[in-house]
Regions:
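Extended hydrophobic packing segments that form well-structured cores
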Residues: 200-236
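Catalytic cores of large soluble enzymes that bind and process phosphate-bearing ligands
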Residues: 11-18, 116, 141, 202
Length: 236
């Protein structure tokens, strides 16, 4: 669940109320939620927001600060009991290791498309396990990346939850996670789970003809930018 709209370095405490109210509403219908700060919140407000959310017991808070701020994230993790999640902007075991050594993270979220594929994400998971840290791979992406993550999840003892893009709000037009495969039924969700794929390879069959057709005239995708109130570049 997205955390907040953009906040100033120091903002009115009332600017945090919407995030807290939305979490309360989700919990009221018997569901759990993690809260994604997207690294857009600065330390003065992140401390307040983490404390305000804590009584409502989110599953985790994600990227409460930019990943460059290892010591500040460690301090925040000592301030609240809520698990700290991060890792989509960390691209290797070497990027991950300082957070593990500092005790700054409880749930690592490596992205298989960023960190070098199946081999490296398995090494990251194994390294995290030695620090009693879970993994929840970042993947608001397509079927190939998700299928690869599912195969890793089936072998990682410290895997806890998998992000997926099915029905996500920024899918383009009529395209979704199920659009590019001959066997979209592998993504059927029942009770919050999908079945482990049994097909060859990653377990999905790509509709290559459809991919070629939809890619005609396509332009390179550029990550959107998110600007702060003073014109500063924020994380997306």
């Amino acid at each position: 669940m997205n955390g907040t709209e953009d906040l100033g370095w120091l903002d009115s405490p009332t600017a945090l109320d919407d995030c807290v109210d939305r979490l309360k509403a989700v919990k009221a219908i018997g569901m759990d939620a993690g809260i994604d700060f997207h690294g857009r919140v600065h330390k003065p407000m992140a401390k307040q927001l983490a404390k305000a959310l804590e009584p409502h017991r989110p599953m985790f808070i994600e990227e409460p600060l930019l990943s460059e701020h290892i010591n500040e994230i460690k301090d925040l993790s000592r301030l609240v009991g809520t698990p700290i999640a991060l890792g989509e902007r960390l691209h290797s075991r070497w990027d991950v290791r300082p957070f593990l050594e500092a005790g700054a993270v409880d749930i690592l979220q490596p992205d298989i498309s960023h960190c070098g594929g199946i081999s490296e994400i398995r090494r990251i998971a194994a390294l995290a396990e030695t620090y009693d840290v879970a993994i929840a791979p970042h993947c608001p992406l397509g079927p190939i990346a998700l299928a690869a993550n599912v195969q890793v999840a089936a072998t990682a003892a410290n895997f806890v939850i998998q992000e997926m893009s099915l029905g996500i709000h920024y899918n383009d037009g009529n395209q979704d996670l199920t659009s590019y495969t001959h066997n979209p039924e592998v993504w059927n969700v029942e009770g919050g789970y999908i079945k482990l794929m049994q097909g060859p390879g990653l377990g999905i069959e790509i509709d290559e003809e459809q991919v070629r057709r939809l890619s005609e005239g396509a332009v390179p995708w550029i990550s959107p930018t998110f600007m702060g109130p003073g014109g500063e570049l924020r994380e997306w």
